[in-house]
């Protein structure tokens, strides 16, 4: 089974760069305190790094 990580949005996407809003949408995050469980891949890690100031990651 693939390793998964939990990603929680902690800050609003209002007044953020359009690229960062699109990244949150790509991660499946919709609003503050929304949590999704994702497969740990290099692509997902790159997306998380791009919006690291708006999300919290649990291994």
Swiss-Prot record:
GO CC, any one term: cytosolic large ribosomal subunit
Domain of life: Bacteria
Gene Ontology biological process terms from the UniProt entry: translation
MF-aspect GO terms: structural constituent of ribosome
Coiled-coil region list: none
InterPro entries in alphabetical order: Ribo_uL30_ferredoxin-like_sf, Ribosomal_uL30_bac-type, Ribosomal_uL30_ferredoxin-like
Alphabetical UniProt keywords: Ribonucleoprotein, Ribosomal protein
Matches recorded under PANTHER family: LARGE RIBOSOMAL SUBUNIT PROTEIN UL30M (PTHR15892:SF2), MITOCHONDRIAL RIBOSOMAL PROTEIN L30 (PTHR15892)
Family: Belongs to the universal ribosomal protein uL30 family.
Oligomer and partners: Part of the 50S ribosomal subunit.
Protein name: Large ribosomal subunit protein uL30
Gene expressing this chain: rpmD
């Amino acid at each position: 089974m693939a390793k998964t990580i939990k990603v929680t949005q902690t800050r609003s996407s209002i007044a953020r760069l359009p690229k960062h809003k699109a990244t949150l949408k790509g991660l499946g995050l919709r609003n503050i305190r929304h949590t999704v469980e994702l497969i740990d891949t290099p692509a997902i890690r790159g997306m998380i790094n791009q919006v690291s100031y708006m999300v919290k990651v649990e291994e």
